[in-house]
Every structure is written in C-alpha cells, then in structure tokens.
Amino acid sequence: MEAGLIDEIGCFRKGGAGVVSGKTVIHYAPDAERVPFLVNDLFEWLRTTDEHPLIASCVFHYEFEFIHPFADGNGRTGRLWQTLILSRWRPIFKNLPIENIVYKYQKEYYKAVSYTHLR
C-alpha cells in the first residue's frame, strides 16, 4: 500500500529538484542543502515586508516555487500560501480559484515562470 509514496513527506527535500513542462526542464531548484536557509529567509521577508499584499503574495509565490523546498506538492503549497496571504488582506480572496486559473492557463504560467528565470 505504501509503494510509490514519497519518502520525504513532512520535511524538506534531500535531493535535486526541478520544474518540468512536458519533456522540458524549465527550472532547476537550488541545492537541497540551501533549502532550510532559503525558506527561513523567505518567511522572514514575508513577516517584515512593507510591500502591498498583492505584490507580497506574488513575490512569495515566485520565490517559493523557485526554492522548490519539497519533493512533491510545491505548486499546490505555493498557491495555498498565496491565497492565505491575499485572504488575510481581503477575505474575498479565500474564494479565488487560483488552482483552476493556473490549470486553465498552465502553458502560459510555465512560460512566464521560465521567462523570469532568464531575466
């Protein structure tokens, strides 16, 4: 019953990671050894930032996906955090279907993420 389950559930990834679209790697994540520091730094930034919540949520989402801290579920977790950040600012955002929007425009989403890595 446990066959195929990820061994790293509940902790940061221990190996390399990346984002793949089809057969194309669009992002290689930072080394696993750097993940705890990077995640801590990201949450410290979120705690202390004066950026507008719309900007902060987007920066957080992008940086979280860039770090790619887990072996699986990074996209869902990043979008969940973005929704949380926005809904703490304006409760209406609790009902924003970010998952559906990303799924509908997944090709464009990955293209935009890939483009930002080139800048």
Predicted regions span which residues?
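FIC/Doc superfamily catalytic core
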Residues: M1-R119
